Amino acid sequence: MNRTLQPDRGASQTAPAAHQARAFAPASVANVAVGFDLLGYPMDQVGDTVTVRRIDTPQVRIAAIRGIAQPLPLQTERNTAGAALLSMHRDLALPFGFELEIDKGIPLSSGMGGSAASCVAALLAANALLEEPLRREHLYRYALDGEAVASGSRHGDNLGPLFLGGLVLCTLERLVPVTVPAAWHSLLVHPDTLLETRRAREVLKDPYLLPDIVTQSANLALVLAGCYHGDAELVRAGLRDVLIEPRRAPLIAGFTAAQQAALQADAMGASISGAGPSVFAWFQTRSAAEAAAPAVRAAFTAAGFDSQAWVTPLISPGARLL
């Protein structure tokens, strides 16, 4: 499966096909235990949809935000989708503007990449309205500016998977697709509670010990090697977080029990999705992931939270025009 960055359809057009476009971007799992701010993949069963209209006034404005994540700022500079389009608009010095409407399907502060989804969907839709649409790696730079509004830092682990699909290694300069066996699936469980990204980052400020950093680096190497070779035992040996999870786990009621439930169901590994509170786990088959879901959800029920669960292949599609 070729997941290298490609120009969008219509990139050679000399005039926009329409004055309105819509795009969908799915939820995503970021960090993946061993790749803090570096590694992520999409979960395409839930996501955000953004409609962008081309307007004569050279400005970016948000007309409406609807859906399950409320309230979110309508001020362009304070909204990830708006900030990303502002970055594009200023960089290209466009003589026209954009008006956008955001339909949120991803819960707020869920660790499911909601800010990234709105951001990428907005960029894809706006890009379709340009006389000469840009390649997706160019859009990635604008998306990084948008994501910084939500978390206070530029990081691409939620963004890259939405541009490429599948498991992606994301630096600030490039996106690298990671080969994964088609049979491997991810379980994602979201408890009905909030954990703000900025708060989750605050607990990471204290220094880390060098031996822990070395261990985490080795774990990342094991996971990447296991993915490329299709070796579940390598992944099982490496898919554990010794840096971020120990500091964030106390912020998530029920996390430890949920993680143990997944591991007892033969998960290759389980940890916090993004900043949390959602939890992900990797399995070698869809049936194993589906069988584990009730026990993981039960752990959050015992902690006092309702929850939702989704199962998707690790090789899932990213954002797309509608």
From Swiss-Prot:
Protein's GO biological process: threonine biosynthetic process
Catalytic activity line of the entry: L-homoserine + ATP = O-phospho-L-homoserine + ADP + H(+)
Pfam families: GHMP_kinases_C, GHMP_kinases_N
Localization per Swiss-Prot or TrEMBL: Cytoplasm
InterPro entries assigned: GHMP_kinase_C_dom, GHMP_kinase_C_sf, GHMP_kinase_N_dom, Homoserine_kinase, Ribosomal_Su5_D2-typ_SF, Ribsml_uS5_D2-typ_fold_subgr
Primary location class: cytoplasm
Keyword Signal among record annotations: no
GO CC annotations on file: cytoplasm
Molecular function terms, GO-annotated: ATP binding; homoserine kinase activity
Keywords, comma-separated and alphabetical: Amino-acid biosynthesis, ATP-binding, Cytoplasm, Kinase, Nucleotide-binding, Threonine biosynthesis, Transferase
Catalytic EC class: transferase
Record: residues binding ATP: P107, L108, S109, S110, G111, M112, G113, G114, S115, A116, A117
Pathway: Amino-acid biosynthesis; L-threonine biosynthesis; L-threonine from L-aspartate: step 4/5
Keyword Aminoacyl-tRNA synthetase: no
Annotated EC: 2.7.1.39
Stored PANTHER family: HOMOSERINE KINASE (PTHR20861:SF1), HOMOSERINE/4-DIPHOSPHOCYTIDYL-2-C-METHYL-D-ERYTHRITOL KINASE (PTHR20861)
Family of this protein: Belongs to the GHMP kinase family. Homoserine kinase subfamily.
Protein's job: Catalyzes the ATP-dependent phosphorylation of L-homoserine to L-homoserine phosphate.
Name under which the protein is recorded: Homoserine kinase
Species the sequence originates in: Xylella fastidiosa (strain 9a5c)
GN (gene name): thrB
